[in-house]
Amino acid sequence: MLEKTMFFSSNEIERAVINEVLEEVYKALKEKGYNPINQLVGYIVTGNPIYISSYKNSRNKIVGIEREKLVMALLESYLEIWDV
């Protein structure tokens, strides 16, 4: 049986990590009863990690990603949905 080796660019891997972190943080904030969108926007706009709960290590996960990269990943995802 032949197996194919798959190659992924560092951008693809980075984006997958960002998406995973955003999903985990979103779910954790929702579990705690917060409005995840408002909390994430507050963090992205101000850079103040106090907007993100430490529940399930969410704060540490999100601050491990540059805010600029978060915005880029969100914008790219949005534009992909609209096939722009």
Regions found by a protein language model. Give the residues of each.
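Intrinsically disordered, low-complexity, basic-enriched segments
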Residues: 2-84
